[in-house]
A protein has these predicted regions:
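Anion-binding catalytic surfaces of enzymes that hydrolyze or transfer phosphate/sulfate esters
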Residues: 158-195
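N-terminal catalytic scaffold of extracellular/periplasmic and nuclease hydrolases
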Residues: 1-137, 141-161, 166-167, 185
Length: 195
């Protein structure tokens, strides 16, 4: 997680009657995600550290502490000809996933972040929630329609397949997706689709 540490992981392992997902990982690593401005990070600064390798101030996404945009690993991979994507169960505009595809000084600028995402040309697949930030906007724009016009294929639920070169946007909820107990096999299905 973007701000989680080993004590939280170990506590979950102790509380669980069965092995946690973390115990099934073949390898593990640690990254220091404290923010530039605070000893305790938030999802924006933590997500930016993971996505870009740059520390930033709490609340900022996709840019360094001097408010200068920095490339995320998705941008770097895309420039090398690789396909990229994000699969999340939160808003796609939420701080952690947004750190991979948007640049903003305030993690709560959801409509601006959605606009950044809609204009992002270095990602091929976006799956998550947060549809309202693309459609129910103060500026009256429908970013899903704009993305569709620009070649994206939009769906509001998981699909079985797509053409290899299509850009796909799946926003399966107005806000966050339901809890893991309520959403069933959405995440494994979305992950399989992405791969």
């Amino acid at each position: 997680g973007d701000g989680m540490s080993t004590p939280q992981i170990y506590a979950a392992m102790l509380a669980s009657d069965s092995p946690t997902s973390f115990e099934r990982f073949p390898v593990s690593g640690l990254v220091k995600t404290n923010s530039k401005s605070h000893k305790i990070t938030d999802s924006a600064a933590g997500g930016t550290a993971i996505a870009t390798g740059h520390k930033t101030n709490n609340g900022m996404i996709g840019m360094n502490s001097d408010s200068i945009a920095v490339p995320s690993m998705l941008e770097i991979f895309s420039e090398k000809g690789m396909k990229t994507g994000l699969v999340v169960t939160s808003y796609i505009t939420h701080a952690t996933p947004a750190s991979f595809v948007a640049k903003n000084i305030n993690r709560n600028n959801y409509e601006e972040i959605a606009l950044d995402i809609s204009q992002c040309d270095n990602v091929n697949l976006l799956i998550g929630g947060g549809r309202k930030h693309f459609t129910d906007r103060k500026d009256g724009r429908n970013l899903i329609d704009e993305m569709t016009y620009n070649g994206w294929k939009y769906h509001d639920t998981l699909i079985n397949s797509t053409e290899n070169n299509e850009k796909v946007l799946i926003l399966a909820a107005e806000e966050h997706l339901p809890t893991s107990a309520e959403r069933g096999d959405f995440l494994p299905g979305a992950t399989s689709f992405a791969l």
